[in-house]
UniProtKB/Swiss-Prot annotation:
Residues recorded with modification 4-aspartylphosphate: 54
GO cellular component, as recorded: cytoplasm
Domain Response regulatory per the UniProt entry, residue ranges: 3-117
Alphabetized GO MF terms: DNA binding
Record's keyword terms, sorted: Cytoplasm, DNA-binding, Phosphoprotein, Transcription, Transcription regulation, Two-component regulatory system
UniProt protein name: Transcriptional regulatory protein DesR
Annotated source species: Bacillus subtilis (strain 168)
Amino acid sequence: MISIFIAEDQQMLLGALGSLLNLEDDMEVVGKGTTGQDAVDFVKKRQPDVCIMDIEMPGKTGLEAAEELKDTGCKIIILTTFARPGYFQRAIKAGVKGYLLKDSPSEELANAIRSVMNGKRIYAPELMEDLYSEANPLTDREKEVLELVADGKNTKEIAQELSIKSGTVRNYISMILEKLEVKNRIEAITRSKEKGWFK
């Protein structure tokens, strides 16, 4: 019998997932929680075979919990609405065995759990495509400017550091916002982090 812990902050989905998996003859949901910390505490104490987690939960996220549980022997499966390459890359680094999207068919989750228990890794196909197809649209100089923005530097400081005029820096920032399809500098930094484009 495969023992499973589920961490999901949407109560209705948490209940539905638990009910669905308990219908499987070879699976038993032994615990449920609504935060990443719930998952960390339960897994360390009870050591279930599998832990299924959402990413965005109050307090500790699913990715932070996965990083903390990397060496416990529990197989982590991320189940999320976020098909973001940056999240996916971080999950892979954390040793996550499965990464599925919430719009996947329900039987796919049960099959993924069995596959993971057999030593396989199961990742949503569309994420694998995105991982290899989504290139950073920024030029090297634009990347340099954005990294300085992320370091908290203002237009004047960036101009001094790169030995260019403030107006040129503003032009670069306008191009960055346009290429990343965002409204401001904060969104540009967030988008680049999500895509895993920062060094």
